[in-house]
């Protein structure tokens, strides 16, 4: 939860020292072995990293299990990325015909991983502009999971996001 602009986990304030993570391996390419995942976690722990954002899509389900086991916090991001479309009036976030896509991609993320205690924040997507589709998707996620904050990096102070995180 967030209270007085402070992120709390189990009622206690936490200082996030985080990193973004893409599913890519120097040897296996887009196939990341469990051994490499564990190696990554151990390196992060040595560097005092305590949180990871699964940018810009959900990760291999084994990653969430390992984060539960090793005690890494997660911001679990849905696979919404459309920055090539533009952020202004062309943003897909503003077109009603893309609302179902916004919700379905977040539904897949949240319903797949909701039982992982390592997830402390849901992320609606990345660099897709801002509009009514994100407002309605935020409401949908909050209705399904009232226990976790929801963020969207294009959401400002007057937007539907629990965490202000501008790029």
Segments the model singles out, each with a brief description of its role:
Residues 41-44, 51-167:
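Substrate-binding/catalytic cleft of secreted carbohydrate-active enzymes
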């Amino acid at each position: 939860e967030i209270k007085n602009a402070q992120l709390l986990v189990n009622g206690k304030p936490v200082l996030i020292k985080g990193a973004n993570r893409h599913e890519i391996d120097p040897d296996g390419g887009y196939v990341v072995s469990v051994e490499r995942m564990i190696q990554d976690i151990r390196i992060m722990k040595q560097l005092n990293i305590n949180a990871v954002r699964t940018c810009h899509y959900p990760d291999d389900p084994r990653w969430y299990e390992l984060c539960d086991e090793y005690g890494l916090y997660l911001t679990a991001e849905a696979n919404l990325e459309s920055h090539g479309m533009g952020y202004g009036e062309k943003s897909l976030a503003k077109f009603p015909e893309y609302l179902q896509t916004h919700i379905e991609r977040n539904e897949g993320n949240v319903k797949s991983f909701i039982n992982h205690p390592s997830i402390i924040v849901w992320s609606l997507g990345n660099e897709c502009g801002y509009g009514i589709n994100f407002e309605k998707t935020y409401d949908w996620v909050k209705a399904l999971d009232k226990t976790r904050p929801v963020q969207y990096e294009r959401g400002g102070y007057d937007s539907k996001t629990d965490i202000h995180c501008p790029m």
